[in-house]
């Protein structure tokens, strides 16, 4: 955590978000029989992830508005559903209801603007980041129950919270596992863990649903376990879906 004090203020006012470096290393991905997990989270398997960078916060309305304003770069990418709904329109709230294609287009626009490679994280990268360097813990903060979170019962009533206001996990990530589901790069396969490679898994080569991670303001259980998986078709636009950008390390 030695770099946390040097992190920029949240949220960023420029086109690039505050970024956290996720170190390379092995970790145990998935949930074992002792956890309240789903079959698609098993078996637990060892995975190596190369170092990469991940945005400290989910992409905000303010950041997404800059993408929409860049007319030459967003042909066919209209304002997301709920863009003008006052429940979801604060500049510091995460943008909601972009499709997976919209999220990818945003990454491509930001890459062209900054000459750096922005993209969506893989499922494996997301889970490593959410765990914060600790093995087999249930939640981004550890194994303490959800009710241990401050004001848990009164939060996320009708919409996601503004980013950067909750506690950071051990890597310095805000709302990792909460607020909105986050699109991942991978196609989803419930049985993928049985054939996943050990190093930098990218997901199956094709599919019908795209993977997502993290919890949702709209669900009864507001924060997801680190190992929990979810997916929807890539064209869907839901009010509890958003995304967080990853960035390749400069070579």
Q: Residues of each region from the PLM?
A:
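Short, structured beta-strand segments at or near domain termini in extracellular proteins/domains
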Residues: 239-251
């Amino acid at each position: 955590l030695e770099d946390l004090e040097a992190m920029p203020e949240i949220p960023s006012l420029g086109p690039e978000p505050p970024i956290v470096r996720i170190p390379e290393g092995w970790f145990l991905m998935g949930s074992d029989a002792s956890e309240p997990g789903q079959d698609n989270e098993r078996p637990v398997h060892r995975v190596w992830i190369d170092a990469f960078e991940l945005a400290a916060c989910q992409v905000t309305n303010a950041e997404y508005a800059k993408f929409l304003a860049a007319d030459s770069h967003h042909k066919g990418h209209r304002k997301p559903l709920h863009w003008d709904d006052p429940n979801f329109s604060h500049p510091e709230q995460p943008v909601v209801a972009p499709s997976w294609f919209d999220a990818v287009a945003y990454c491509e626009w930001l890459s062209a603007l900054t000459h750096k490679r922005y993209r969506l994280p893989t499922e494996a990268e997301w889970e490593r980041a959410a765990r914060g360097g600790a093995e087999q813990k249930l939640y981004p903060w550890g194994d303490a129950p959800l009710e241990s979170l401050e004001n848990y019962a009164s939060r996320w009533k009708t919409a996601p919270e503004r980013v950067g206001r909750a506690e950071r996990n051990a890597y310095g990530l805000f709302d990792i596992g909460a607020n909105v589901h986050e699109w991942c790069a991978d196609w989803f396969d419930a049985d993928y863990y049985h054939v996943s490679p050990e190093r930098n898994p990218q997901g199956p080569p094709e599919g019908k649903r795209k993977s997502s991670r993290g919890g949702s303001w709209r669900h009864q259980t507001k924060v997801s376990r680190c190992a929990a998986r979810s997916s929807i078709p890539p064209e869907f636009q839901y009010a509890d879906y958003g995304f967080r950008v990853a960035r390749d390390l400069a070579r």
